[in-house]
Amino acid sequence: MAIAEDLLTLASRLASPAQGEPEQASFRRSISTAYYALFHLLVQDAVQSWAGSSTARFGLERKFEHKIMKEVSNSILRSSWRGWSIPSPVVPMELKVVARVFVDLQEARQQADYDNAKAWVSIDAIDKVADAQLAFENWNRIRTHPAASECCSRS
Amino acid sequence: MATTYLSPQQLKDFAQRVNEVAKKFPDEVVRIRHSFSRDWDGDPAIYFRILVTDDAEQRYPLPELTGRIEDGLIKDLGLFTSEYSVYIPYFNYRTKTDQDRLKDPEWQ
């Protein structure tokens, strides 16, 4: 999980830029990086269980789509998600936290990367990084849970 | 393009309930503004703009503060379980000092 955790560390650093560093650019990169930290955490875990070569796994990682991952997350939040096993696994609260943060961070990332009219403040970046950290903690608790495995395989 | 499927009365009720949630956090929340719109890929969305007191921002760990407010909004408004669940909720925060400096009309 090195890249995901490294990205989270970087996002945290960017959320509190040193004096003289460009604040707006730092906050934007912090939020965007926090999203990608969580994205890569989920994608890497999803492909870990896939029995292919490392080259094939890297190829598989590139197939994950942001929009579909958002749709799966939203269905988890609205209790409409169904896994592929019967009966469908119960969704743990930790997975709902991860889903909620994923959806929120994806929207924030879009704004941070593309909405140049928006002015960001320190609390924006610190809040989103804290959310990403919360999602990491929750994911680490349930990463082997059947619901976690199945929702990743649907993305 | 319509930004909401809700009737004027539903919108009024929704706004009132948002204010009621804000009142549950008198020491932490200055006010909560919201708007219905579309998110980055066109899904219906509610954007909450939550202005927190400087004191609360300093007194509480940020995840605890924002978590309590978001849980209050999600639970009291039924954001994932009611007719509002068609909208994806997004939460943004600012301190009063930030807003006094930026004077952003959407947050007034």
Regions found by a protein language model. Give the residues of each.
Chain A
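Terminal alpha-helical segments
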Residues: 1-155
